Regions:
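Patatin-like phospholipase
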Residues: 1-36, 44-350
Length: 350
């Protein structure tokens, strides 16, 4: 059976929903979903087959979407510290209300998908692995909150007579839980966030999807970053399955190979004129293009053709005067082949 495992990672979690969009496009059906912290919340929406509701929840995320108290966004770290001292953490009942608003419990329990989450008993520090069969409509959202309570930044979650904290304190990527539920083929979406990693003990074919770009802080609410993370998740997943290419930037499939043939001779001939024995490979072409885009601060969420990105590069260089000295040096036969000189050489042939 196919399993989807979602790590914890706070406000980086939109990445997982973007990744799931790609998996849907690739016709992946999962029989098992497990998650920790934000991964547990995302996993509940996926189990309920409410992908679009999850997107809406993330796109609407603002500071008051999470916290009951009115906070100064510019001093959010100080607000966290103040609440840790005065209130034993932030009150996140607003998040609970919004999960209740968007997540259909009926669809969750009607779904044939097996589900599991992880939380930790605050007093005993023992983990609690909870499967769908142990949940009901009354306690589902409470346990989602328990798995996500990043104590002491957030208040712990009391359920019946026990208090619970974030499952990431024990198992931030519950792969073995998915195997226990029956998964033998797993896609694990790793936010590379703070949390305990367990060495996988069970046997399963595992494919990891990890971010190529910076997803921003785990605890700072930025709607702009959230929307970027949705794109990053989609792009990285399509790259992981060889449907797109690139690393920090994203290009349509086979674009780099196509343009390598077009530029290779020109680039190497010009390099030889500068007395540099230089070979242009596909990987080096990618690195030069992406380095250029990074310096020029070109949008890294979009999917480009090389022709399109070259036009943007040329326009930016003309308008802003980037690499002016390096381009002059090429004309004067002064070239070191530091990355900026490689970029200038590339710009001169596109």
């Amino acid at each position: 059976m196919k399993g989807l495992v979602l790590s914890g990672g706070g406000l980086k979690g939109a990445y997982q929903i973007g990744a799931y969009k790609a998996l849907k496009k690739l016709k992946y059906d999962f029989q098992i979903v497990t998650g920790t912290s934000i991964g547990a919340i995302n996993g509940a929406f996926i189990t309920a087959k409410q992908y679009q509701k999850a997107v809406t929840l993330w796109e609407n995320a603002q500071i008051d979407f999470l916290f009951t108290e009115k906070l100064n966004e510019n001093l959010i770290v100080l607000e966290y510290i103040r609440n840790m001292i005065e209130n034993k953490g932030m009150n996140v009942e607003a998040l609970k209300s919004n999960i209740n608003k968007y997540l259909s419990k009926k669809k969750f329990f009607k779904s044939e998908i097996k589900y599991g989450l992880v939380t930790v008993n605050k007093k005993t520090l023992k983990p609690k692995y909870i499967s769908k069969e142990e949940l009901n409509e009354d306690n589902l959202v409470d346990y989602l909150m328990a798995s996500s309570c990043f104590y002491p930044v957030f208040q712990s979650k009391k359920i019946e007579n026990d208090e619970y904290v974030d499952g990431g304190y024990h198992d931030n990527m519950p792969i073995d839980f998915a195997i226990k539920l029956g998964a033998d083929e797993i896609i694990a979406i790793d936010l590379e966030a703070i949390g305990i990693r367990k060495k996988v003990q069970g046997k399963a074919k595992i494919k990891y999807i990890r971010p190529n770009n910076n997803l921003g802080p785990e605890m700072i609410v930025s709607n702009k970053q959230i929307r970027k993370n949705l794109c990053y998740g989609y792009n990285d997943t399509m790259k992981a399955f060889n449907k797109l290419e690139g690393k920090k930037y994203t290009f349509k499939k086979n674009e780099l190979e196509k343009y390598l043939k077009f530029y290779k001779d020109k680039y190497e001939q010009l390099a030889r004129k500068k007395k540099k024995d230089y070979q242009l490979t596909k990987e080096e072409l990618r690195r030069i293009i992406e380095s250029t885009c990074t310096i020029l601060k070109i949008d890294d969420t979009k999917i480009y053709t090389i022709k399109k990105i070259n036009n943007i590069i040329k326009k930016q260089v003309e308008q802003k005067g980037f690499f002016k000295e390096e381009l002059k040096n090429i004309n004067k036969k002064k070239i070191t082949f530091a990355i900026n000189d490689k970029i200038a050489l590339y710009i001169s042939i596109i």
